[in-house]
Design a protein with these regions (language model features):
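Glycoside hydrolase catalytic-domain groove-lining segments
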Residues: 210-225, 329-377
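Aromatic-rich peripheral "rim/lid" segments of glycoside hydrolase catalytic domains that contact
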Residues: 125-136, 409-481, 512-541
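Substrate-binding cleft of secreted/luminal carbohydrate-active enzymes
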Residues: 158-165, 256, 366-454
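N-terminal carbohydrate-binding/catalytic regions of secreted carbohydrate-active enzymes
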Residues: 68, 72-75, 163-247, 397, ...
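Active-site cleft segment of glycoside hydrolase catalytic domains centered on the general acid/base Glu
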Residues: 236-323, 327-347, 377-386, 417-435
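Boundary/entry segment of secreted carbohydrate-active catalytic domains
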Residues: 35, 42, 122-204
Length: 542
């Protein structure tokens, strides 16, 4: 009996094994069929693309992509969403294109395709349409909400700065007449609080005596770009470093000490693939200057905005860093236009976003050098109008989107350490100069240490109510169009205000809407008066 039962048990096991094998085979077969169906549908979608039937192709790609996601074939899924985004762009349905590329970024990231993910996100950002509203208020209304209590930090507002010694219209290095501390304010119509100087590590502080003397006489500070041009190895805890700190402390001039900036980029000689090496040197310099120059020096850590992925690796620590800066430039580049129309659709303003989100909660953040070029250098094409728009939008909207920004330095030169001509010089372009004058005339931008902006901004949204009274309203409006010419505001279908330039400031009376939640329709138009986008912004009125 036991043998019989054993045979029965064995037989049952064999039957179960055969059944499991059949099920597994059937499942694999089903998956193979699904895969074959997916690739068959893909070929059909490609054919539809070739015929210009983009909507039908999109429908096919949308059937395929989820199947690849289910099978965790994330690279293939990303490819499908790339095509969905591309086809929506061809149909000029840009919001849908953005959604497709965002999914491409997501799944290419899951597939470990980092660069593809970054490129997809960049395309999405360039075509993304959005709007944010702000109301102007007083500095007293925001109090210390935007301050950190750091050395040299204005409670509200941003110190105005520039690099100007290479502009021949404002500075003659041989005769010191003119000198930029005098002539640059005359050129721009406003006193600047600080000027950037480059300084080679190992030189005595006395080598820039004329700059220090003029800064002291003009009541301006210095952002000292301390550069170890022989590499980090020359930076030691020695007599030179301590003497440099003592000399700066005795100078009577306030100094932002920007040590070895842009360290995250491989184009600087002090770049190291081992961030700990850089961090150790920064912390050494910070330790010496905090001890030897406690009244005159604020330590500045200033990476380049790119590459983003390694910025945090080089951060030396809160105890070593007083301010966080960033290099922020825009040069017209049509090669990345998602629509292939030869436009640069990037936002100069949003290039500040990453560094702000990373550090503004704990440190004063600022643009330690930056500018917008008025030439497309590769083609020698004039892009003044584009540059003026981007510059005006940047200075006008920066205080609204990034209220904890504490200084902005314009790079007033057409040259830097590279051989490439960059075209940022204000005196060389009357329209750019006029735009700069307009941009920095805002009282938010401060001419001296100790000043405070009388104005501030608060969001106008469902979460941040506005008073039921007339308000001075501004907006940040980002669209696929590189520039805009007009923005209108409508409530309940009725246009209540119109503005003709960034930050799209207008007077809107919210009194009729007290105690209500409303939608403000923000309509943006291009230079041909064509509607580009309508963004509905929910606003609570108290």
């Amino acid at each position: 009996v036991r043998i019989y039962r054993g045979r029965t048990t064995f037989g049952r096991k064999l039957l179960l094994l055969l059944a499991a094998t059949l099920i597994a085979f059937s499942t694999a077969r089903a998956q193979d069929v699904q895969a074959m169906d997916a690739w068959g549908a893909y070929k059909q979608a490609q054919k539809l693309d070739g015929q210009g039937k983009y909507a039908e192709a999109i429908a096919k790609y949308k059937q395929i992509a989820p199947e690849f996601v289910k099978q965790r074939q994330y690279g293939n899924a990303a490819g499908m969403y790339r095509r969905i985004g591309d086809d929506y762009a061809k149909l000029q349905q840009y919001d849908n294109a953005v959604a497709g590329w965002e999914l491409e970024a997501k799944y290419s990231g899951l597939a470990g395709q980092t660069q593809i993910s970054i490129a997809a996100k960049r395309r999405a950002d360039m075509l993304r349409s959005k709007a944010s509203l702000f109301v102007e208020t007083t500095a007293g209304a925001v109090g210390g909400a935007n301050a950190h209590g750091a050395k040299f930090e204005p409670k509200n507002g941003a110190l105005l700065g520039a690099y100007a010694e290479l502009d021949p219209a404002v500075h003659n290095p041989k005769t010191a007449n003119p000198f930029y501390t005098d002539r640059f304010p005359a050129l721009t119509g406003k006193k600047h609080a600080a000027y950037l100087l480059y300084f080679t590590y190992g030189q005595p502080f006395s080598s820039i005596k004329s700059h220090v003397d003029h800064a002291r006489a003009a009541g301006t500070a210095i952002e000292l770009g301390l550069q170890p041009l022989k590499g980090l190895g020359e930076v030691k805890d020695d007599a030179y470093l301590h003497q440099l700190a003592r000399d700066i402390e005795a100078s009577g001039v306030q100094v932002f000490l920007r040590f070895a900036n842009e360290m995250n980029g491989d184009w600087v000689i002090w770049h190291t693939k081992d961030p700990n090496e850089y961090i150790a040197k920064f912390r050494l310099v910070a330790k010496v200057f905090h001890r030897e120059a406690p009244n005159s020096v604020a330590m500045v850590w200033a990476p380049d905005r790119l590459p983003e992925y390694n910025i945090q690796d080089y951060y030396p620590g809160d105890d070593a860093v007083d301010w966080v800066g960033v290099s922020l430039y825009s040069i017209f580049d049509p090669s990345l236009d998602p629509l292939g129309q030869g436009e640069d659709r990037s936002s100069h303003l949003e290039k500040f976003d990453n560094i702000y989100k990373l550090y503004a909660a704990r440190k004063p953040v600022f643009v330690s050098e930056g500018g917008v070029s008025y030439m497309y250098p590769e083609k020698k094409q004039d892009k003044t109008d584009w540059a003026v728009y981007k510059m005006n939008e940047f200075y006008a909207t920066l205080p609204m989107l990034y209220p904890k920004v504490k200084a902005v330095f314009w790079f007033d030169s057409n040259h830097d350490a590279s051989a490439r001509i960059k075209n940022y010089m204000l005196s060389a372009n009357p329209k750019l100069l006029a735009g700069y004058k307009q941009s920095v005339s805002s009282p938010f931008y401060l001419s001296s240490f100790g000043d405070e902006s009388p104005i501030a901004y608060k969001p106008a949204s469902a979460a941040s109510p506005v008073p039921a009274s007339p308000q001075r309203v501004s907006a940040y409006v980002k669209t696929w169009s590189p520039t805009l010419a007009k923005v209108t505001y409508a409530i309940g279908g009725r246009t209540v205000a119109t503005a003709a330039s960034p930050p799209w400031t207008a007077q809107i009376d919210f009194a009729p809407y007290g105690g209500k939640k409303i939608e403000v329709d923000v309509r943006a138009y291009d230079g041909r008066n064509k509607l580009v986008t309508t963004q509905k912004v929910p606003v609570s009125v108290k």
